[in-house]
Amino acid sequence: FFKLKTAYEIPLRLVGSEMCIRDRYREPFLGGGSVALHISTTFPHLNIWVNDLYEPLTNFWQILQKQGNEIATRLTEIKRESSDCRILFEDSKSILHDRGFTDLERAIAFYIVNKCSFSGLTESSSFSRQASIQNFSMRGINRLPQYSKIIQRWTITNDDYEILLTDLVNAFIYLDPPYEIDSNLYGKKGDMHESFDHDDFAEKCDQRTAKMLISYNSSQLIKDRFSKWSASEYAHTYTMRSVGEYMKEQQERKELLLLNYESRSFKK
């Protein structure tokens, strides 16, 4: 949905296989919502609780849930009337945290900034002409009411991830935390990425007994933190940038999947 990270095929398969026998799904780091949307369409009966600490993002999801048609209508008008996406991007960026605007106006601003930013990184990125052409499209806007219907039964919160951690035997938790890399990708100018405590995160997850799947960047340090968990790597690139040494570095990166339970569909 949002270009925060892509290539969720393996997590989707693993989560999907578990939800056949679960009735509660939790996602503490909602982000672009790809996994939660898939789970909602595949298992519409589930109790789904999603969360993110980044308030402009959760505000968007909450408004989309309540006013999907209105968001689509307003965005259609804005796109037709706007001749300069860069100016629209900068104006929208200034609205995100300004409570002088309505939640609907801030949600619309978030959508514009997300779709027009480099790699969809919103406040942690700059304007991208390529992204504004490819992603801020009528096709995407027209699909918003459809997404609104899918998420009607979601519980959407703006809180710390740990409130969703549980020991419930009928719950499954998918966690997609900020990656432990040099680039600060999340929050306002990367503040939420920079301040994330990875050691504390590993400790809190390890203390819980509900079934959990975590997607992370792969490193020996992370593997050591989760030494009791099943781990698997796969190639994964999550950027729109495709030139030079940066792309070469991206291609060498691996995604790490961590499970605190045994799974037949999980390859170590």
Map each language-model feature to its residues.
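SAM cofactor-binding core of SAM-dependent methyltransferases
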Residues: 24-91
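Short His-Asn-centered micro-motif
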Residues: 28-29, 51, 157-159, 175-177, ...
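Short loop/helix-cap segments at secondary-structure boundaries that form the rim of catalytic
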Residues: 42, 165-168, 221-228
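Long, positively charged, glycine-interspersed low-complexity recognition regions
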Residues: 194-268
